[in-house]
Design a protein with these regions (language model features):
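Alpha-helical scaffolds flanking conserved acidic
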Residues: 70-76, 105-110
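Short alpha-helical scaffolding segments that buttress acidic/His motifs in well-ordered protein cores
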Residues: 55-59, 76-83, 111-116
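Acidic, glycine/proline-rich low-complexity segments that act as flexible tails and inter-domain linkers
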Residues: 2-72, 100, 126-144
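Amphipathic alpha-helical interface surfaces
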Residues: 51, 73, 90-94
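Substrate/cofactor-recognition hotspot
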Residues: 121-125
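Mid-chain, well-packed structural core segment of small domains
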Residues: 83-109
Length: 144
């Protein structure tokens, strides 16, 4: 087994590249091209790019790629946490991702109800507004 201190710089660069590529694939599959492209474009400056790289590698390339939870379960967990944190734009993206991962409207609604009880009604109400708008938009997109 290799310890972190024994990894050489080329090995580290290769590991980052592998995680980034895996993460980018998962990120596109879950969040969709429009959201990912906008996030990457918004993080394309020299200052902001490292944050997008970290999100893609650590979040999507590492945690989302782990065994043990299905993508739908991860999406529902994110919905609950983002509702509790009152992170509207990210919540909207993850509601869309949950639908893309096979979550039903009922599962999303029940997740938000559960979150509302534990994180507070104002956060839950806001979460419902955001989720309903996303679901409505996605249903309209299907009709077109």
């Amino acid at each position: 087994m290799t310890s972190p201190s024994s990894i050489t710089v080329p090995d580290e660069a290769a590991a980052h590249k592998t995680l980034y590529e895996k993460g980018l694939k998962i990120r596109y599959e879950v969040a969709g091209p429009a959201y990912v492209d906008a996030a990457l474009a918004g993080g394309s400056s020299t200052f902001a790019r490292p944050m997008q790289e970290l999100v893609t590698e650590a979040c999507w390339g590492s945690v989302w790629a782990r065994p043990g939870l299905e993508r739908k379960q991860r999406s529902l967990l994110n919905i609950a946490m983002l509702c509790a944190l009152n992170r509207g734009p990210e919540l909207a993206a993850h509601v869309r991702g949950a639908v893309n991962n096979g979550a039903s409207e009922v599962e999303i609604r029940e997740t938000l109800l559960q979150a509302a009880i534990y994180c507070g009604m104002p956060a839950g109400i806001e979460g419902f507004k955001i989720a309903e708008k996303v679901i409505r938009t996605m249903n309209e997109e299907k009709k077109q």
